[in-house]
UniProtKB/Swiss-Prot annotation:
Signal peptide: none
Gene: rpsM
Protein name as catalogued: Small ribosomal subunit protein uS13
SUPFAM superfamilies per UniProt: S13-like H2TH domain
Entries under InterPro entries matching the protein: Rbsml_uS13_C, Ribosomal_uS13, Ribosomal_uS13-like_H2TH, Ribosomal_uS13_bac-type, Ribosomal_uS13_CS
Keyword Oxidoreductase belongs to the record: no
Span list, region Disordered: 89-121
Biased composition (Basic residues): 100-121
Subunit structure: Part of the 30S ribosomal subunit. Forms a loose heterodimer with protein S19. Forms two bridges to the 50S subunit in the 70S ribosome.
Pfam families attached to this UniProt entry: Ribosomal_S13
Originating organism: Prochlorococcus marinus subsp. pastoris (strain CCMP1986 / NIES-2087 / MED4)
Length: 121
């Protein structure tokens, strides 16, 4: 396995797809990295030469990926919570941040249903 940005990328996949296993690298950024380095996107990772792997390592260092990106996102969220803005409070309460409805839906964000006892008549 080739190790790029601290991640073992899968050997059997095409380079274009394998680079997306790195957190912070999607298909668009993967294509950009490959065009900048001149590596063929259709080649498999196992067929890459050592010089190609070195080029890819150098190109990914130009971007914020993996741990640095996770830390940066976490700090941005913590900043919102510290200043007490609406977005920060919504993050803290594990509710949708961007104005979605919560009376129904929002199950992913709110977690599984908690059963509430019905009223006796």
């Amino acid at each position: 396995m080739a190790r790029i940005a601290g991640i073992d990328i899968p050997r059997e996949k095409r380079v274009e797809i394998a680079l997306t296993y790195i957190y912070g690298v999607g298909l668009t950024r993967s294509k950009l990295i490959l065009s900048n380095t001149g590596v063929n996107p259709d080649i498999r990772v196992k067929d890459l030469s050592d010089s190609d792997v070195q080029k890819l390592r150098g190109a990914t260092e130009d971007f914020t990926v993996e741990g640095d990106l996770r830390r940066k996102e976490g700090m941005a969220m913590k900043r919102l919570q510290d200043i007490g803005c609406v977005r920060g409070r919504r993050h803290r309460m594990s509710l949708p941040v961007r104005g979605q409805r919560t009376r129904t839906n929002a199950r992913t964000r709110r977690g599984s249903r908690k059963t509430v006892a019905g009223r006796k008549k």
